[in-house]
Amino acid sequence: MDIFKVLSRGATIQRNGKHRKDLTLLNHAAPKDTQDNVDIEVARETDFFKTKTDTYSKKRVAEEAELDNEEEEEAPPPIISTPEEAVVFRNKHKINITGEDSPLPIGSFEDLITRFNLHPYLLANLKKNKYTDPTPIQCESIPTMLNGRDLIACAPTGSGKTMAYSIPMVEMLGKKKGSKDAKKGIKALVVAPTKELASQIFNAVFSLCVGVGKKKDELKPCLLDKSTADKLRNGKVSSQKYDICITTPLRLVSALNDGSLDLGSLDLVIFDEADKLFEKGFATQVDDILAACPSGIQKTLFSATIPASVEQLANSIMSTDPLRIIIGNKQAAAQTVEQKLVYAGNEEGKLVAIRQMAREGQLVAPVIIFLQSIDRAKALFKELVFDGINVDQIHGDMTAAKRASVIDRFRNGEVWVLICTDVLARGIDFRGINLVINYDVPQSAQSYVHRIGRTGRAGRLGKAVTFFTKEDATNVKVVVNVMKQSGQEVPDWLNNLAPLTQKERDNIKNRPIKRKKISTQHALANNKKKRAKQQMKGLKKMKKDDE
């Protein structure tokens, strides 16, 4: 439905005289049911991320209930009960499993009831939060974790990885919570690279924990943010009251060093976005975290991309028999994302291209635009604000509260275009993103996959456009390789580019291209300014010489 059609709906004027009676309607309120229906339609069209609750009339609720009752009975939930059925399932979803004695995947969440005696409250919470059918990574990882196996899991962005580890984590801890010899304190630890992702994981886990555990003693997750860390440090709260801790590496290491957090009861540690956590920037902190964990605990790693170097490190911390689950290609993007490369020539050409997209109606909200630096994000924000586009920005220079506010406004549809750096590229789930634009070519395949993974999530279709210039002749090969592995069409002349050497990959990742300033000003105007400055310098020098 076109929102502008809804807003501009009019009336048909009758010319047989009967319209006079209808004119009296101008003096009265519109019929409530009709007005409610229009309001609901408009609200739905502007609620990009489906965050608002519809205000249904009683009549509408009754009608929908009647339709539900008329639906045919659903078929029984699927169950995978033999190795042969598992092979068919894995071939269908391009699942590759490495390791001995891998358990059968589940066919449905109901399958967990018979196989693992799933906690009834957990199943109810899944249904309440509209998790009806497990995704391929959930089908494989849930039974693997419930069997106590260490796990390295790689699945496309938007494929449900958070629930893939949250469901078995809550189920395992829920059963222990009700036992007589249950330990007090943090029993599961989830580590994520960014505050935003950690907060999102906490919300997902919290929604699953409702009612799980003994009566009046539910599982208690905590988000180790600044506020919670201060309370722990000051003794206002004890870590013993929590069962699950969700945190970023630096915050956790700080709490471990000052003694405010104890991991002595830990049974499970989960590294989300493991490819980022096992890079050099986080390596020392991850080592400190692992050193604080009891020996022999269960370890799991999840990510959308797992390079060979990261996998090698991951294997070194695992038990002797970890399972490795790969959904699709470990360096490919989700199949639901249509990828496109646009040659812009130079920096001025990028501005022209994005403004042309705006004029032609291609910036269908909501849209995310990625840039390589904070300064460039700020500059593009100023340009698009001047163009009258409903845009905002988010980057590392902003406070956590300000970033959270911008994210909320974007989720609620108050902001249509969001400009950001890679701070938003990992894990943040905006389910309704229509378009991702890489204004600057990303510096690695992992960065590209995570950026465009903000769209095409949970089975929805999305688009990703990457601008590149003549300065990106080498960098663009990173994008081309991912596009090929994802089955996307690549122009012939780009297909013929020589493959990247390891040295080139390292240079691209560690040395960002020095790009010209983002500005509307024409080169001629810049030259005039330059000449004026030179003339001013000359005049000052002449004046100084005369003195």
Curated annotation (Swiss-Prot):
Residues 336-498 form the Helicase C-terminal domain. Keywords: ATP-binding, Helicase, Hydrolase, Nucleotide-binding, Nucleus, Ribosome biogenesis, RNA-binding, rRNA processing. It catalyses: ATP + H2O = ADP + phosphate + H(+). GO terms for biological process: endonucleolytic cleavage in 5'-ETS of tricistronic rRNA transcript (SSU-rRNA, 5.8S rRNA, LSU-rRNA); endonucleolytic cleavage in ITS1 to separate SSU-rRNA from 5.8S rRNA and LSU-rRNA from tricistronic rRNA transcript (SSU-rRNA, 5.8S rRNA, LSU-rRNA); endonucleolytic cleavage to generate mature 5'-end of SSU-rRNA from (SSU-rRNA, 5.8S rRNA, LSU-rRNA); maturation of SSU-rRNA; snoRNA localization. It is found in: Nucleus, Nucleolus. One of its GO terms (cellular component) is small-subunit processome. InterPro entries: DDX52/Rok1_DEADc, DEAD/DEAH_box_helicase_dom, DEAD_box_RNA_helicase, Helicase_ATP-bd, Helicase_C-like, P-loop_NTPase, RNA-helicase_DEAD-box_CS, RNA_helicase_DEAD_Q_motif. CDD domains: DEADc_DDX52, SF2_C_DEAD. Its main location: nucleus. It holds the Pfam family Helicase_C. A motif (DEAD box) lies at residues 272-275. Residues 511-547 are annotated as: Disordered. Residues 527-547 have a biased composition (Basic residues). Interacts with the U3 snoRNA and is associated with the 90S and 40S pre-ribosomes. The Q motif is unique to and characteristic of the DEAD box family of RNA helicases and controls ATP binding and hydrolysis. ATP-dependent RNA helicase involved in 40S ribosomal subunit biogenesis. Required for the processing and cleavage of 35S pre-rRNA at sites A0, A1, and A2, leading to mature 18S rRNA. This is ATP-dependent RNA helicase ROK1. The gene is ROK1.
